[in-house]
Amino acid sequence: SFPAGQQVGVGSPAAGLTVAKLVEAKQLLDENNVDPTLPRYCAVAPEQLADLLNITTVTSSDYNTVKALVQGEIDTFLGFKFIVSNRLSSESGVNRRVIAWAEDGLLLSIGKDITAKIDERADKGYATQVYYSMSIGATRMEEEKVVEIKCRED
């Protein structure tokens, strides 16, 4: 779980992802002296992407690229590069936990490097079997460089 100082609340009334929530997340990172030249990312679920696409400021060519309306994609906004994922957790299936971070705030570790094998299976009519595995994990390295944004989902 995240420290209270690193969370953006769901709001009152509860809302999905809004520009105000993104501004607050940016402010939290800035107040924690996160280097503004470091790339910043925001992992969102498809519903949060839809929330942003429904906001005129985000899709307006005055504020963002025309790509937002033409292709239904938002690449960057307020300095965050958006990554869409269906694997973000939620609280009681109601509030999605969107994560925003500076590049060096998270660390990826490789426990076991890639193992790949390609064999024939005699018991399956000599069909080709492909086996591929690796062990990886990620964690917050610096709490102040990672922010949780709670977003209501309907």
Stretches with model-predicted labels:
Residues S1-P3, E103-D104:
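Short amphipathic alpha-helical segments, especially helix-boundary/capping motifs
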Residues I55-D154:
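Sequence/fold signature of self-assembling virion shell proteins
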